[in-house]
């Protein structure tokens, strides 16, 4: 089967979303608490409140979408590990 332009655009959108928050995609079903702090809804809300692009930046994996999770990732992982156990 050959790729069609419409399917290519869908693949780009998926890659952009997943690249914004790589850890959230893996932890989504297991740890919903991660989503509230650092996940897609939280990250999207921060970006839109601060006026740094909002959903558009997150959807394409912009710099704001990548910086927010990276800055708070280690602390959240440690806390989440303690709470979950």
Curated annotation (Swiss-Prot):
Keywords: Plasmid. Residues 47-61 have a biased composition (Basic and acidic residues). Residues 1-85 are annotated as: Disordered. It comes from the Bacteria. This is Uncharacterized 9.4 kDa protein. The lineage of its organism: Bacteria, Bacillati, Actinomycetota, Actinomycetes, Kitasatosporales.
């Amino acid at each position: 089967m050959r790729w069609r332009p419409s399917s290519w655009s869908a693949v780009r959108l998926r890659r952009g979303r997943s690249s914004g928050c790589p850890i959230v995609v893996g932890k989504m079903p297991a740890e919903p608490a991660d989503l509230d702090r650092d996940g897609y809804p939280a990250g999207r809300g921060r970006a839109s409140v601060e006026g740094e692009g909002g959903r558009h930046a997150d959807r394409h994996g912009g710099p704001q979408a990548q910086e927010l999770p990276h800055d708070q990732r280690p602390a959240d992982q440690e806390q989440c590990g303690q709470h979950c156990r």
